[in-house]
Amino acid sequence: MRAIEIKNLTFSYDKQEKVFNNLSLDIEKGKYCVVLGRNGSGKSTLAKLITGLLTIQEGQIKVDGIEINEKNIYDIRNRIGIVFQNPDNQFIGATVRDDIAFGLENHLVAQDKMDQIINEYAQKVGMDKYLDKEPSNLSGGQKQRVAIAGVLAMTPDIVIFDEATSMLDPKGKKEIKEVILKMRELFKDMTILSITHDVEEALLADEVIVVDNGEIAIQGTPEEVFIKDDLLKKLSLDIPFVYKFKNLLGKNGIEMDTIDIEKMVKKLCQ
């Protein structure tokens, strides 16, 4: 079953050059999909169109089989959660507890049930010991984990990370990647779509989509995408170190059937 279906999508800002021109793309339910692309490639615009934050001009987008339009937009938004780039801009509550509660309060969840949900999802992202902390006492990675807890508390079918690690230090980025991996374990049917520059994150995904000039330049598993190092360089994208190493070995006649560095070294030493 498809979580997201995009057919013949065309979009431009203020009659400027088209960001997308007849784009079609399907994302399967329960998959972890990473969208890569250089600045201006259309990655974040795609996320905003899927969530209904931008209006579709031509073509069609369906979420869980429901077409995005004025009639269905609120239903669509209830099915999708989004974590944005800047952790400070999305922290609404005075404390961690208040921030996770924000969406639940808007849905008139009873207080006793709300407390249970807050504790449950704070624990899932490792923030249960910080429930009464103010945002000024949290790191960027911790704030993003709170944002994720608030999204998960609403039990969406799809979670979109829109450059959610780009403003974080290495420790914060590692924390968010660990949370995403945990989400995959806990929520098997949840679809995760991550818009990012981080090629190392893409190693963890089921599918990688490379966008360039509003078109799908490459799509496939991490293995299928990162083996195309020459094409990725033309698209101004780096590749993960492990694939640089593997591709270099391949060009020198040494084929590897793994991307585990330790296994590669062991094989080379045989």
Language model features: what each stretch is:
Residues 213-214:
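Conserved ABC ATPase "signature" C-loop
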Residues 134-138, 142:
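Conserved ABC ATPase signature
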